[in-house]
Amino acid sequence: MLRCRSSINILQLHSRFHTHEIIISSKESEARTRITDEERLVIKRFPIFKNDSSYILPSSNKLTKVKKEHIALKIHKIKKLFGEDPNNVGYLNYHLPKSYPVPFEINNRAYDNSDGNGENEKVRNRLSVTKLLTKRWCELREAYDIYSETPLFEHKQIIEGKLVHQKLEEDIHPVTEDLESFVEDFEVPIPTDNFHNHVDDLFSCSMRLLSLFRCGEAREVRCHAFLDSRTGTFIDGLPKDGKDVLVSGIIDHLSLRRKIRVFTSSGFTEFNGLNDEVFENGNNFQSIIEWLNANIDFLKSEYQINVSDVKTRMFRSVVSQKSVLKYSKYQVMYYRYFLELLGLHPDVTYGQLLNSSLSRGFNIDQRIDPAKVIYFMASDEVIVDDMRKLRDGDDIGFPPFDSDFTGSSPTEEEYDMSILSDQITDPNVLERYGEFLVPWKRPVTLKYFAARLAQMYNCISPLLSKHLTLEYYYKGDNFKNINFDFNEDEIRNGAFDSSMFWFGKRDIEPIEPTSENLITYCKYCDYVNVCSWRQKATQQKKELGPRLLKLNQN
């Protein structure tokens, strides 16, 4: 496999875009979900630990102590909020609490402790793509989990899935030896605070979109859209107010492919990107973007970008539940749709990226630490020419960004890279970057990285294929792919239905109480033995036989 030059950020190996955290051992996993001593005292008073048969845990003989405590705490919290079903004593009510905030506010309020300086990575006014899939399993289970406000329990399958994702990512975006050596030997501390890590995410996403053309693949690519909570529809412009909610996700796999495979006497030729063509006029953003825009008609006729999602399995088989498969497809459709929206108008996307950064609590005008700028140039020389332009006060060729400096007076605080001159003595570093260790006419801010990322989204959007893929992996082996087509109407309807739930415009819609569903969906649910919806359905089925028999006798 061709290993792409777009590398993983060596300074953030512990966190891929703040989502794919790698847990090495089950002990560490338990530590993340370990319950406090105070909570443990509360739990010991629960009926679940007093031999109350109505609170028996699902498959309790197979659960660890930590998992049992985790479930018990959730049930305790939900019972306090939802109360018991008045028509089914001992079981949980399955209607949204009328006197309590709607699901979105519950999901959102956990993020209200940001200090305004970006020191909290949680995002206000946001949903993830997976949060739109409320009916993937059972919406009632989803609602209980939301209102319990309890962190996700990371079981073995989640941990192994993250490891598979990391391995796939490193295969395409390895940490280069040159960058490892640079970071190890660099004499100036490279900042890794939340703000600089966020900027790193923007830079890394641009590099991954470039890697589509360098080597034909990219993994772990960020995308987003804004959902109007009033109408349940996605907008294609800038958010107007707090009612437009950020929905974000990370795409597992993008691949650039020929529309028609090339066959020679030795068989089909392997496609490894368009590195020679795209970079023939120089390895810098402006020339690359200009080439892609100038050749877009040719590219559309010959190539397409496929969007895929990776699903890891504990067995060599795909999911059997129809709703799980349906909403897994929706997930990929959302990703593809978001990329399409992001590519429509680069100036709008630029504004959205800035808005997204603001929602994370970051100052979009904050200057990037000079050591981080050197690190970015060492990571990929594609930005070196842009850094020269900013240093010299020249435009980079993207008007929405360049206009910030048009007719402006010198900034109150000079952006001075010369402060590193006395700290850097390595002759190799001075030879490569000495020209930048001077006062700059324009500062490097988050806005620059948002600008180039917006342009890259615009370059790939026209190439998006209607054909999408679910990739199934077992122990690192891609044993099955499911191909399907993009359907915009389906995800528009799905987003509308999900938003009605999140913003409290409809009640919870539990899974259909068929015999098959009660077995395949409910068996391993944390709430299986306190769920009134399930208990009523089960009881009705038990009574159905005698009722039919009685009718027959009459």
UniProtKB/Swiss-Prot annotation:
Q: Keywords, A to Z?
A: 4Fe-4S, DNA-binding, Exonuclease, Hydrolase, Iron, Iron-sulfur, Magnesium, Metal-binding, Mitochondrion, Nuclease, Transit peptide
**EC code(s) of this entry:** 3.1.-.-
Compartment annotation:
Mitochondrion
What GO cellular component entries does it have? mitochondrion; nucleus
The record places the transit peptide at 1-17
Cofactor note from UniProt? Answer: Binds 1 [4Fe-4S] cluster.
- The record lists [4Fe-4S] cluster as bound by C138, C522, C525, C531
Q: Per the entry, which co-factors are needed?
A: Mg(2+); [4Fe-4S] cluster
Gene Ontology molecular function: any one: single-stranded DNA 5'-3' DNA exonuclease activity
Q: Name one GO biological process term.
A: interstrand cross-link repair
Q: A Pfam family for this UniProt protein?
A: Exo5
Similarity-based family: Belongs to the EXO5 family.
Q: What does this protein do?
A: Single strand DNA specific 5'exonuclease involved in mitochondrial DNA replication and recombination. Releases dinucleotides as main products of catalysis. Has the capacity to slide across 5'double-stranded DNA or 5'RNA sequences and resumes cutting two nucleotides downstream of the double-stranded-to-single-stranded junction or RNA-to-DNA junction, respectively.
Quote the subunit structure annotation. Answer: Monomer.
The entry's protein name is Exonuclease V, mitochondrial
Q: Which gene encodes it?
A: EXO5
